[in-house]
Curated annotation (Swiss-Prot):
Assembly mode: Part of the 30S ribosomal subunit. Forms a loose heterodimer with protein S19. Forms two bridges to the 50S subunit in the 70S ribosome.
Keywords linked to the UniProt accession: Ribonucleoprotein, Ribosomal protein, RNA-binding, rRNA-binding, tRNA-binding
Protein name (database record): Small ribosomal subunit protein uS13
Organism: Methylacidiphilum infernorum (isolate V4) (Methylokorus infernorum (strain V4))
Gene: rpsM
PROSITE patterns per UniProt: RIBOSOMAL_S13_1, RIBOSOMAL_S13_2
Length: 131
């Protein structure tokens, strides 16, 4: 298994499928990295030499791709900024509701979490069968 930018790349996969394991690199960026590093996209990650790994890292840094921890931190800071200025999107993040205008009267279960069932309190007489 090759280690690129602190991430273990699965060795049995081709580069075009293995590079997207890195957070911030998708299939199109993986293809671009392979072209610029002059590597065959179908080459297995386990067959990479140290020189080729260094070339991949160099291409990622030269293009200014923000990946892994830096990207996660940047996204988190953007959300915190929205929350601190109390804009609509920030308030939606705070309340745990959909941010991009989706409906919430029904659906939105992923964002809202599982349903919270609310029980009904009944009078003691109603339990005994008396009205």
């Amino acid at each position: 298994m090759a280690r690129i930018l602190g991430v273990e790349i699965p060795g049995n996969k081709p580069l075009i499928s293995a590079l997207p394991v890195i957070y911030g690199i998708g299939r199109s960026r993986a293809k671009l990295i392979c072209e610029q590093a002059e590597l065959n996209p179908q080459m297995r990650a386990k067959d990479l030499t140290n020189q080729q790994i260094n070339r991949i890292i160099q291409v990622i840094e030269e293009n200014g791709f923000v990946v892994e921890g830096d990207l996660r931190r940047e996204i988190q800071q953007n959300i915190k900024r929205l929350q601190s200025i109390r804009c609509y999107r920030g308030i939606r993040h705070i309340r745990g509701l959909p941010v991009r205008g989706q409906r919430t009267s029904t659906n939105a279960r992923t964002r809202k979490g599982p349903r919270k069932t609310i029980g009904v309190v009944r009078r003691k007489e109603a339990k005994k069968g008396k009205v």
